[in-house]
């Protein structure tokens, strides 16, 4: 008798340093998704394909990534999560696992994602694994004026690394601001969806304005025109975290 399938929802945190992003890639490329699938397949002795709410880039971290997969295994989830965490690298941790409705999909059921970028004013031997650096004191007031421009529905083509897919380049941002937390300037942004490297390009542009190397009007024109200057490179991946996913 065939066993019925269950949909499992996981909450995952990871240090993205040393991984070629979230998404599985062919060959021997090490990714977060690939590591989790490898471990789950070993435990349950069946093929596993997981879907993540956010496809983080190489070097980007996650505090609360959400992923889902379907399985025919009857293994109790308490045993499964314990076994998985004992086999996963120390830089990946499944913090929760529960059965979800059959229709649940970690990516397509999500209503919004929140990212946070941590920025230091000066390099740090301790914190640089989880922060970018502006190499000086930025004008956070100017950066917050730019953050206000982002709220609403806009075409973020200028702040994306990829060509438009079938979903286009329109994103609806519901929150965006800089705030101080100890040594860090932190940028919090929430939207219904994000383009590839979008947050890192936005942060890079805001840092350029904050450090006086780019005018606020030039940033606004990038947003309006869909074009960015070739010299603008994405901010260091080390500072970016997928912070929360809402359903």
Swiss-Prot record:
GO terms for biological process: tRNA pseudouridine synthesis. InterPro entries: PsdUridine_synth_cat_dom_sf, PsdUridine_synth_TruA, PsdUridine_synth_TruA_a/b_dom, PsdUridine_synth_TruA_C, TruA/RsuA/RluB/E/F_N. Gene3D superfamilies: Pseudouridine synthase I, catalytic domain, C-terminal subdomain, Pseudouridine synthase I, catalytic domain, N-terminal subdomain. The active site is at residue 57. It comes from Chlorobaculum tepidum (strain ATCC 49652 / DSM 12025 / NBRC 103806 / TLS) (Chlorobium tepidum). Formation of pseudouridine at positions 38, 39 and 40 in the anticodon stem and loop of transfer RNAs. GO terms for molecular function: RNA binding; tRNA pseudouridine(38-40) synthase activity. Substrate binds at residue 115. It catalyses: uridine(38/39/40) in tRNA = pseudouridine(38/39/40) in tRNA. This is tRNA pseudouridine synthase A. Belongs to the tRNA pseudouridine synthase TruA family. Its EC number is 5.4.99.12. It comes from the Bacteria. It is an enzyme of class 5 (isomerase). The gene is truA. Homodimer.
């Amino acid at each position: 008798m065939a066993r019925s399938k269950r949909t499992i929802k996981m909450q995952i945190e990871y240090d993205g340093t040393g991984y070629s992003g979230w998404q599985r890639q062919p060959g021997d490329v090490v990714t977060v998704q690939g590591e989790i699938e490898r471990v789950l397949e070993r435990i349950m002795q069946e093929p596993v394909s997981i879907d993540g709410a956010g496809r983080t880039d190489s070097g980007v971290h996650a505090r609360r990534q959400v992923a889902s997969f379907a399985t025919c295994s009857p293994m109790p989830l308490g045993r499964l999560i314990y076994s998985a965490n004992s086999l996963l690298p120390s830089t990946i941790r499944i913090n929760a696992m529960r059965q979800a409705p059959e229709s649940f999909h970690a990516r397509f059921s999500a209503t919004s994602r929140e990212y946070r970028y941590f920025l230091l004013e000066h390099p740090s031997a301790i914190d640089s694994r989880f922060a970018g650096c502006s190499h000086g004191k930025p004008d956070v007031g100017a950066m917050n004026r730019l953050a206000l421009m982002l709220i609403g529905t806009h075409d973020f083509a200028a702040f994306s690394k990829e060509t438009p897919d079938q979903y286009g380049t329109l994103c609806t941002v519901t929150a965006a601001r800089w705030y101080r937390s100890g040594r860090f300037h932190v940028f919090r942004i929430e939207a219904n969806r994000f383009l590839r490297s979008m947050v890192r390009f936005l942060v890079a542009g805001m840092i350029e304005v904050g450090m006086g190397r780019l005018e606020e009007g030039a940033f606004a024109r990038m947003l309006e025109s869909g074009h960015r200057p070739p010299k603008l490179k994405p901010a260091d991946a080390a500072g970016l975290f997928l912070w929360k996913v809402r359903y």
